[in-house]
Amino acid sequence: MTRREMKILVEVSHTSGHDVRTGIQAVVRGLLSGLRLARMNFQTVRWSRWRNAFVPLDRYRNQALGISDLSERDRCPNEIDRVWLLLPEVIYGPKLLRMIAYARQQRMRIAAIFHDAIPVTHPELVRREARKFHSAYMTALGDVDLIVAVSDSAAEQFRLYHEKRLGRVPTIYVCPSSGELAGEERAAAKPNAIPDTVNILCVSTLEPRKNHQTLLQAFELASSVVSHPKLYLHLVGDRYKDADHIVELVLAATRRNPNIAWYGKITDHRLIRLYRESDFTIYPSTIEGFGLAISQSLWNRRPCICANYGAMAEIAKDGGCLTVDVGDAAKLSDAIVALATSLDLRQKLAKEIDNRPLKTWQVYATEICRQFEAVD
C-alpha cells in the first residue's frame, strides 16, 4: 500500500489544548513533526462529545502543536483506501470507548502508542486519576489493531496484563521514541578541557517515581567530597498533581544550597540552551515506560547517569550512559563524582554517543507508518 492510499487521523485532544511538557506530550509533538517531514497523509483531530465524532483541529491548535504549515494536500488527500486512527495520548474515561466504537463504525484501523503500565503495577507512585482509570484504559486498548510500545519493558507489561485478564493480545510493535527536540539544533559536544565548574542537568517532572529526594541527597554527598570543580545541579520539570511534597522538597534544597536551581516548566528553546551548558545529565527515575530524558540527553551529546535496570537500561545498553542503582544515594553520589572529576570518562561516554544510532522523529514516524502497512 502506498502512502497516498492511506490517511492517518492523529487524536491529540489533550496536547493541543494544554501547554504541558511531559514526556508523552513531547512524543506527541515529535510524532507530528515526523509525520509532516515524512510527508505522510495525516490530519490532527480531537474528539467532539457533542457530535460524537472526530473533528479536525483548527489552525490555532495546529499552530500550538508546531504544524500550522500543513498543506491542504497533506490534510485532505483525494483518494484514500485505508484510514488509520492513531492514539498517541493516554485517554481516561468513557471517551476512549466512544472513539474506538466510532472508528470501527467508520471501518478505520486503530493503533495506540502504549507508554507504560506504571499506574497498574505501582499505583502508589501516581496521581489518583491514574490509579483509578489506567486499568480500564489498558483494557480498552485490547480492542485496537496495533499497539506501538515505547520499549520492550512496556510491551511486556502490556502483554502480561492482557494475557492474565483477557487472553487476547493485539499485535505489539516496539518502537522507541526519538530524543530529538523538534525544531531545535542538536547540541555540540563539550570542549575537551577541564572546567572549573560542572553543570549537571536533570529533566524530570516532580513526581514520586522520579526519585528527586535520593538525587538531592546524592548531590549533597558529592558536593561535600568534591572541592574542584564546583558542582551545580539544574532541575527542569513541572509540578505533578498530588505531589506538592516533592515541590517543597526541591524548594527547600534550593534554599539550603545556592548551587541547586529549579526552573519548572520551560520551552524547548531554553531546554536546549541548558543542554549546551551542561556537562552531563542525571535521570534518577526508579521506573519508566521508556525514559525520554535519557534519549534527549544522548541526542544532545551529553552522557547520562541513569538506572541499571528496566527501560532505562534498554536505552543505556548501546552506550553513552553510566548506569547505577539509583535507589542508593551513596552509589548515585559515586557516579556523580566519577563523571564530574574524570574528563576521560566523560569523553569515553561522549564517543559512545557518537558511535550509537539515534533516530529522528521523521524516522520514528516513518517506522510506525511502515508497520501500519505491514498490518494491512
Give the positions of each predicted feature.
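Carbohydrate transferase catalytic cores enriched for Leloir-type hexosyltransferases
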Residues: 1-376
